[in-house]
Amino acid sequence: MPNLRFLRGYNDAVVLGLARSGAVTRVDLAERSGLTPQAVSKVVARLIDEGLLVESGTRNVGVGKPRTLLKLVADSRLALGAQVERDELRVVLTDLAGDVLDRAVAPLPPDFDPPAFVAELTRLVNGMRDDKLLGVGLGFVGPLDHRTGVVHDATGLVKWHDVPLRELAEDSLGLPVVLDKDTNTAIVAEAWRRGEELRDAVLVLVGTGLGVGLLLDGQVYRGARTNAGEFGHTTIQLDGPECVCGRTGCIEAVHNLAARSGDLAGATAIVGLAVADLVQLLDVDHVVLAGRAVLAQPEAYLAGVRAKLPTADWLPVEVEVTPLGDDVVAAGAAMLVLSEFYGRPR
């Protein structure tokens, strides 16, 4: 029975993923999913009964009767997602399509502690509750354990050591909570909205810190302890500035020093060098740039990264700034909740 439940859930997720891209017919679903027409019919009937899909119009296909179009009922299920930076909390409400319906932003005091954070999170969430809400996702500063919901030693946050944040948030909110690194939720956002077109990608988040989210063969890569992506704390300059992590010469520290001193060209070149190393190491074909530093100077960061990437014709890499803007981490945290119910394993 568990295997049957898994198969149903997987097939449902495949069909819903295709429906997120626009109206589709049952024939489209069978051709694009690899499922049999009989399996598609069963899945579609189940999703219609659950209010997730609706029949909406027809499409003429030449000879024969028109085919019925199926449309995702995007607002049938909702989720909240939060981005926690070292100085700000952002909460967004998203639907099944990954569209942001509402948002709230509040400053966080210097060196905020867990009780103060949970209180502010609860205040913002209470202002955005909805009967169709499935849960709350948190995109937090690492290192943390995605599986246990514990924040271990959040870089730059001195009062966050082995904090059971998921448990604290669930107790306060009375809702299911999912915790992950901010870089991971950001890449989840891109993968959720793009579906199968995004398979091997890195998302570079340049905000108060610097890290990457990794999508490898269509799956978010978290590593053995769910802390993959701490790329900002790899060394790029042996005699470089001290970093908040305690080391010296980290990519994050060198970048931030250049940015604070007004050396935009130097800051973007450092990010470009780091991204080029990732591309060479992982052989990804897509790079997404995100975070407040990038959004403040998008063209400069795009140029800085593109200038450092390999130029071989057989090694094309697409580089872009996230279309989700400031919401990418929080929206991805919400989509992580949605994927727990209606997505493939991420």
Feature locations, PLM:
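ATP-binding/phosphotransfer module of carbohydrate and carboxylate kinases, centering on a glycine-rich
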Residues: 1-58, 62-67, 71-127, 131-132, ...
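Glycine-rich phosphate-binding loop and adjoining helix at the ATP-binding site
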Residues: 100-200, 298-311
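Short, intrinsically disordered, charge-biased short linear motifs at domain edges
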Residues: 227-236
